[in-house]
Amino acid sequence: MTYESFAYWYDKLMNEAPYDAWQSFVQKKLKQYGRQGAKRILDVGCGTGELAVRLAKEGFLVTGVDLSENMLAIAQAKAEAQQVTIEFFQQNMTELEGFSSFDCVTIFCDSLNYLLEESEVRQTFSRIYELLKEDGLLLFDVHSTYKMDHIFQDAIFTSNDEEISYIWSCYPLSLPHSVEHELTFFVRGDDGKYERHDELHRQCTYEIDQYKQWLTEAGFTVLEITADFTDEAPSETSERVFFVAKK
């Protein structure tokens, strides 16, 4: 199986991801914080472009950034199929070069957790601050420390259907609040035989106060911290933490 076809199957598996909720979160926060006239959005860690395309169809001028060339190929094809214009760039989120003056920057689907060094998170916040217009918003989510330390630790998740099945195993790393994801996919080909593909991902998260400190050091004002697509503050057992920060 080529990496291009793996990106295709990844996109299929992510169909159940809460894109409606992420899209609603963006539009709600832009309105809530007086940015109804916002037009330019940078979607960092855009993957196969699902959220970027949805936002573009709502009239936003969207730019997408991702490290994976193959994911971006799917994203570009998706944008063309939906007849929307989106600029896609293959970059590490610590770089973010070649564009500026955004009303809003988003980093969803725990993409920020792929940065394993504190310096990388801080650099990313600093670059985003430079790219935002005055009063522009940064919206992002991360895995909670509870999810990393309790739900993911030594966990195994499985899924099975006729076209694609996977085994997803999680192991702790030496870093605090970090995990290694070992994913094994079995995809059925046209001949009915299954082909195996292995993926390895590492993620790390930090305490909420640490993210707040880094945002403040980068120049941001933290407006709101909530959890799990609600308006409630994070609890000890929250799994996904959302931040809203303003330049």
UniProtKB/Swiss-Prot annotation:
Q: What class of enzyme is it?
A: transferase
Q: What is its EC number?
A: 2.1.1.-
Kindly state which keywords UniProt assigns to this record, in alphabetical order: Methyltransferase, S-adenosyl-L-methionine, Transferase
Keyword Electron transport assigned to the entry: answer is no
**What function does the entry list?**
May be a S-adenosyl-L-methionine (SAM)-dependent methyltransferase.
Family as reported in the entry's similarity comment:
Belongs to the methyltransferase superfamily.
What's the protein called, per UniProt?
Putative methyltransferase GWCH70_2453
The species is: Geobacillus sp. (strain WCH70)
